[in-house]
Amino acid sequence: MKVWMAILIGILCWQSSVWAVCPAWSPARAQEEISRLQQQIKQWDDDYWKEGKSEVEDGVYDQLSARLTQWQRCFGSEPRDVMMPPLNGAVMHPVAHTGVRKMVDKNALSLWMRERSDLWVQPKVDGVAVTLVYRDGKLNKAISRGNGLKGEDWTQKVSLISAVPQTVSGPLANSTLQGEIFLQREGHIQQQMGGINARAKVAGLMMRQDDSDTLNSLGVFVWAWPDGPQLMSDRLKELATAGFTLTQTYTRAVKNADEVARVRNEWWKAELPFVTDGVVVRAAKEPESRHWLPGQAEWLVAWKYQPVAQVAEVKAIQFAVGKSGKISVVASLAPVMLDDKKVQRVNIGSVRRWQEWDIAPGDQILVSLAGQGIPRIDDVVWRGAERTKPTPPENRFNSLTCYFASDVCQEQFISRLVWLGAKQVLGLDGIGEAGWRALHQTHRFEHIFSWLLLTPEQLQNTPGIAKSKSAQLWHQFNLARKQPFTRWVMAMGIPLTRAALNASDERSWSQLLFSTEQFWQQLPGTGSGRARQVIEWKENAQIKKLGSWLAAQQITGFEP
């Protein structure tokens, strides 16, 4: 049974990482990319352990480390350890730090919990791990996690942290505890405030040479008492009595993954005294401490929070021309999940903005969700060794180009079709960019209103348009003929807001053509500059030709 459970969990892990495909690199390119990222992470490790500083956010470090491991596995290299051991770590832990295996999702956690009982959930406090050794009731030794077997002697530093009891009694008088030294926070809401680089800040304080008063800004959360009382309730009570009160406050019994999910969500949104990056589920029954080894803990697992920002690989750079002629740049990404949203594209902005970001295919960028769930770029966290950037199209477009189709007008022409089909314009439900591209590719539109001439048979025979949908589209196209005059003028791209257009009382094409600049200028929200744009627009030859064509189609307001 356990074998099958392991297989199922493995399948789930594989499914969750299926998007992380191997790069299509030559062996030489792979060696160069891996070597460069390896050197950078080593430099970050040196800064972290030697000087107690971090030049990179914890979340970015973790994700790039995972990316390096992925590349190494893809190309047969030996994966590195997640974190480099302290260079001077020579103090043996009385009990090894095992580390904790990560569950990819709730289903994997449920499978793991199914064969275990007496389970408890704790916050996965974000700081640095430590061993506290008490002998004869006094703090005898404090050791950094290091490589799990050996670490640095932190006794002097920890003795200055007021939150760490220096004396204990009873069962704890001769005990070994494992826990997390963390940055004390008041009302930290993880959902809103994120990780604030807490791990690096704690490491920095612990690595400083001077015994600064700032050590009192640190606290400790004990998460393991090897060879302690068998009952979790007894452990929690003794720890609380000794002064480790947070462990009792934030340890809860759970029966299934649903209960864990509720607690996890509660702590994600609640005010806590520390930064967290998920939860840990542990069985009360643990093996004897002499059997503990790094990476071999079967009695506990972690279920981390989804990062607020994800590192994503840029697969391609694409250029889009909007209906106004402005060129925008879009990065196509290897898919990442943000909240419940699968993100595959992110808008960079103008060509100038793209050049300032200096983004090329193969780069790694940090992506998060802005307001209304729109993906945005936060940073470029890693640039590839080979960087070939595409050439942007010539800036030959403006607000009066591409009403008629041509090879050079492809993108702006499609943008105009998407615009006129929008709800606030002609309201053509059921068709978006892909549908317009399919129609134009098959029927070779002459101009932006050519779709009015399509027959039901033509729509049915359009590749990419389902037959069940073609009748609906034909109905939508016919309904558009009955839209008010102002909607058709908006579809033609008149440079006015809808409110200004409605206030104009213009209800016919001939009336609009004879209106003066002074008339347009007195409309709400329309200054002299916008009024001149309207005059330029209505005098444009393409616009006049479209107006005549709509008149021939007997569209409301365009009839002679």
Swiss-Prot record:
Which SMART domains does the entry mention? LIGANc (SM00532)
Record's catalysed reaction(s) = NAD(+) + (deoxyribonucleotide)n-3'-hydroxyl + 5'-phospho-(deoxyribonucleotide)m = (deoxyribonucleotide)n+m + AMP + beta-nicotinamide D-nucleotide
Q: Which PROSITE patterns match?
A: DNA_LIGASE_N1, DNA_LIGASE_N2
One term of GO molecular function: DNA ligase (NAD+) activity
- Disulfide pairings: none
Q: Where is the active site?
A: K124
Has the keyword Manganese been applied to this entry? Answer: yes
Kindly indicate whether the keyword Phosphoprotein belongs to this entry: no
Among the Pfam families in the record, one is DNA_ligase_aden
Ordered alphabetically, the record's keywords are: DNA damage, DNA repair, DNA replication, Ligase, Magnesium, Manganese, NAD
Q: Which InterPro entries match?
A: DNA_ligase_AS (IPR018239), DNA_ligase_B (IPR020923), DNA_ligase_CS (IPR033136), DNAligase_adenylation (IPR013839), DNAligase_N (IPR013840), NA-bd_OB-fold (IPR012340), NAD_dep_DNA_ligaseB (IPR050326), NAD_DNA_ligase_OB (IPR004150)
The protein's Enzyme Commission number: 6.5.1.2
Cofactor(s) it depends on: Mg(2+); Mn(2+)
Any Gene Ontology biological process: DNA repair
**Which NCBIfam families does the UniProt record give?**
PRK08097.1 (NF005987)
Q: What's the miscellaneous note?
A: Considerably less active in nick joining than LigA.
Can you tell me which family this protein belongs to?
Answer: Belongs to the NAD-dependent DNA ligase family. LigB subfamily.
Give the matching PANTHER family.
DNA LIGASE (PTHR47810), DNA LIGASE B (PTHR47810:SF1)
The role this protein plays is: Catalyzes the formation of phosphodiester linkages between 5'-phosphoryl and 3'-hydroxyl groups in double-stranded DNA using NAD as a coenzyme and as the energy source for the reaction.
Q: What is this protein called?
A: DNA ligase B
User: What organism is listed for this UniProt entry?
Assistant: Escherichia coli (strain K12)
Gene field: ligB
